[in-house]
Swiss-Prot record:
Protein name, as recorded: Elongation factor G
Originating species: Koribacter versatilis (strain Ellin345)
Keyword Transmembrane carried by entry: no
Residues the record lists as binding GTP: 17-24, 81-85, 135-138
Similarity-based family: Belongs to the TRAFAC class translation factor GTPase superfamily. Classic translation factor GTPase family. EF-G/EF-2 subfamily.
One Gene Ontology molecular-function label: translation elongation factor activity
Residue ranges of every copy of the tr-type G domain listed in the record: 8-283
Any single Pfam family the record assigns to this protein: GTP_EFTU
Length: 697
């Protein structure tokens, strides 16, 4: 089948921002103006097309990333609307991994907000070119120039305004196109679908000229040819400048800025024009690199239908009508319904049942997908998020998606025996969909423990378990996910010998342990020379150490950032086997870790409180009493912003305390920053609690 839309006319984009900046409202307008929907859905009414989950409609927030496809100026745009709440950071992470470009939406009053910084850093990590949309320019206190300034200062980015607003707050009626130097004015009665091109109002001419000159200079700085013309004082055409801006945007040297109000239907078409004009097609991005699992060598795949098939699974979802849906991004080649594909991450071949184009939670069946497409697949049984599927004759494993580890957990107990069976199925399905959701069993109490990124995250997962899977359960109080690590180097040996008639068991190893760089995780180094331990027993030792890491040595928490070197040992010709060396590895590690000054690590959150000036003292005092470190204060839109680092354990119930301290006039946001060593008194209390002893005073 021939390609319906040439690859250079395709865009894969995400819409990302801080919670409440207006991402979903912007997406709803995009769908309306591109003819994808015939009625505008509203978040506050619970009718937004992209927020289709019951929990999203009730809370007025986006929880999952919903995918859709629309057409603008004969260009196909695949859009993923991502959540802005920090608890759903995994949804943003996995979407950005497979997108070619993004629209970052900012609130015109606040500019850059805490979660805007988080998603911006995530986009930097995956080198995703972006354009910025300053939304809510009609809101009281809107300030276009301040919003741009926050992008420059707080994100350390180079924004370039390509539009300037005509009027602010309730006087906003259109934008100035800084390339053509014309005013675009919208009509309220036409639902924003039409605008007139007029001359720039006289009172704004000077400001528009200054912004035009700044734009020309910024674009010229990124392009040698244009710079030469600029220095010579030659006139540059709008087409030349736009081509230069496209190159600079794709190279992430600059970020074009547009402006409007999605809710009042102004500025959305010009945003769509910018998506088509400046964001990359799959042909504009570098080829993807992966490893051939057979040879271990790196290989590249470019966006070409004729190359071998390669795609990345970035999301798994359970659909009540068709079962498990796997969302994939195709990087090269093509695939038809009924074809067999090779899961190169797992080494298994599977058959494609159906291929679906998704529009939020509605499905459209298609027969074939090609390079650059994003779609859903039915029929893949063993796949997990981050797996690569490829052509079996040309296997390739692409770089997977990294997800943050959960920082908060609760115990869940089914109410009846039938709930217990249903709960197991429900939790497995939810864990398969969400890589930041973990399910485990407490070895002492036998309780089921679920862990996630925050209280809201767990609340929504429990709500889904009850509604979608009809499970009734009691939920415990939130608990903090502590970690353990070591501070010194130490050595130990593990010797496991068992003699039980016939062949026995013999495993013996000597190891050195030491701290690894924070965030580097576990590292195993094999320094065995001369065959003192045969090659086939090295992996079981590594496995035994990994299992010992899971239970720590202080309070049973996972141990992280540890380097282990295996340097000596011995074996028995008859009695040695894999199990004996696995046990020996575990014994050696536990002994070495106890000698290596083990410490408890606690998750620390980056907290930002926006508060009226008169309550600032009480907020700072409260954060200090929670073991918080004040990192900075700044003035923003008539309020003070207090930034602090606070241990997660001290933040439970903070929202109620903050509201009562400020008569409900403050707001706060927090996201996970890092793990750091817990103070001795706190660590002793936690260890004593786990071991069931009173803490030493």
């Amino acid at each position: 089948m021939a390609r319906q839309v040439p690859l250079e006319r395709c865009r894969n984009i995400g819409i990302m921002a801080h919670i409440d900046a207006g991402k979903t409202t912007t997406t709803e307008r995009v769908l309306f103006y591109t003819g994808r929907t015939h009625r505008i859905g509203e978040v506050h009414e619970g009718t937004a097309t992209m927020d289709w989950m019951a929990q999203e409609q009730e809370r007025g927030i986006t929880i999952t990333s919903a995918a859709t496809t629309c057409t603008w100026r004969d260009e196909r745009i695949n859009i993923i609307d991502t959540p802005g709440h920090v608890d759903f950071t995994a949804e943003v992470e996995r979407s950005l991994r497979v997108l070619d470009g993004a629209v970052a939406v900012f609130d015109a009053v606040h500019g850059v907000e805490p979660q805007s910084e988080t998603v911006w850093r995530q986009a930097d990590k995956y080198s995703v070119p972006r354009i910025c949309f300053i939304n809510k320019i009609d809101k009281m206190g809107a300030d276009f120039e301040h919003a741009i300034d926050t992008i420059r200062k707080r994100l350390n980015a180079k924004p370039v305004a390509i539009q300037y607003p005509i009027g602010l707050e309730d006087k906003f009626k259109g934008v100035i196109d800084l390339f053509k130097m014309k005013a675009l004015v919208w009509h309220d009665e036409a639902m924003g679908s039409q605008y007139d091109v007029e001359e720039i109002p006289a009172e704004l001419l000077k400001k528009a000229q200054a912004f035009h000159n700044l734009m020309v200079e910024t674009i010229a700085e990124c392009d040698d040819e244009l710079m030469a013309k600029y220095i010579e004082g030659e006139e540059m055409t709008a087409a030349e400048l736009q081509a230069g801006l496209r190159r600079a945007t794709i190279a992430m040297k600059v970020f074009p800025v547009t402006v409007g109000t999605a809710f009042k239907n102004k500025g959305v078409q010009t945003l769509l024009d910018a998506v088509v004009d400046y964001l990359p097609s799959p042909l504009d991005i570098p080829p993807v690199t992966g490893k051939n699992p057979d040879t271990g060598l790196e290989e590249q795949r470019s966006a070409d239908d004729k190359q071998p098939f390669a795609a990345l699974a970035f999301k798994i979802m359970t659909d009540p009508f068709v079962g498990q849906l796997t969302f994939i991004r195709v990087y090269s080649g093509q695939l038809k319904t009924g074809d067999s594909v090779y899961n190169s991450s797992k080494g298994r071949t599977e058959r494609i049942g159906r291929l679906l184009k998704m529009h939020a939670n509605k499905r459209e069946e298609i027969g074939e997908i090609m390079a650059g497409d994003i779609c859903a697949v039915v029929g893949l049984k063993t796949i997990t998020t981050g797996d690569t599927i490829s052509d079996e004759k040309h296997p390739l494993v692409l770089e997977s998606i990294e997800f943050p580890t959960p920082v908060i957990s609760v115990a869940v107990e089914p109410k009846t025996k039938s709930d217990q069976e249903k709960m197991g199925v429900a939790l497995n399905k939810l864990a398969q969909e969400d890589p930041t959701f973990r399910v485990s069993t407490d070895p002492d109490s036998g309780q089921t423990i679920i862990a996630g990124m925050g209280e809201l995250h767990l609340e929504i997962l429990v709500d889904r378990m009850m509604r979608e899977f009809h499970v009734q359960a009691n939920v415990g109080k939130p608990q903090v996910a502590y970690r353990e690590t070591i501070r010194k180097e130490a050595q130990a040996e593990g010797k496991y010998i068992r003699q039980t008639g016939g062949s026995g068991q013999y495993g013996h190893c000597k190891i050195r342990v030491g701290p690894n760089e924070p965030g580097k995780g576990y590292e195993f180094i094999n320094d065995i020379v001369g065959g003192t331990i045969p090659k086939e027993f090295i992996k079981p030792i590594d496995q035994g150490i990994k299992e010992a890491l899971e239970g720590g040595v202080l309070a049973g928490y996972e141990m992280v950032d540890v380097k282990v070197t295996l340097y000596d040992g011995s074996y028995h010709d008859v009695d040695s086997n894999e199990m004996a060396f696995k046990i020996a590895g575990s014994m050696a590690f536990k002994e070495a870790a106890r000698k290596a000054s083990p410490v408890l690590l606690e998750p620390v959150m980056s907290v930002e409180v926006v508060v009226p000036e008169e309550y600032m003292g009480v907020i700072i005092g409260d954060l200090n009493s929670r073991r918080g470190r004040i990192e900075g204060l700044e003035h923003r839109a008539g309020s003070q912003v207090v930034k602090a680092m606070v241990p997660l354990a001290e933040m439970f119930g903070y929202v109620n305390s903050m509201r009562s301290n400020t008569q409900g006039r403050a707001t706060f946001s927090m996201h996970f920053a890092h793990y750091e060593e817990a103070p001795r008194s706190v660590a002793e209390e936690i260890v004593a609690k786990v071991q069931g002893k009173p803490a030493a005073r």
